[in-house]
Amino acid sequence: MENKKLKMGEIEALINSCVGKINRKSHVIKNHSFKTDSELKKRYETKKIPAASCFYKNINIKRIIKKLMLESPELTSWILHSDTKRLEIQDDLHHCGRKYDGHGYVECNSCYLVLGKEINPDGHIKKIYVRTCYPV
């Protein structure tokens, strides 16, 4: 797919629309955020998932996802040129700086984001969306 008609402002609009559609019922919020420290700790202990504090309490997950998207060197190329409908981004959460008991001994270190996209029959990108995002 060759989609050279999109300009940088249009790419930002796609990103903003994608992040704007994340809400309390979204998979990323509903399944990967925690209301209490004990809930986070329970998931850590029972599922052996070293959960990052960025998905805890009042942390703005939308802002984290947008930051991951904007800092990804592959995002623009994927939007403009790739036939692949899935993009995986894994990045450090060095900006987090928070620590909760639920972490156990695990540092808040990394986040895994999977994006999807819909393409019109004419080959132009219709929208991008978050398939999932979780701490690793």
Regions found by a protein language model. Give the residues of each.
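Low-complexity, glycine/serine/proline-rich disordered segments
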Residues: M1-N31, K35
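Functional cores of ribonucleases/endoribonucleases
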Residues: S26, S33-V136
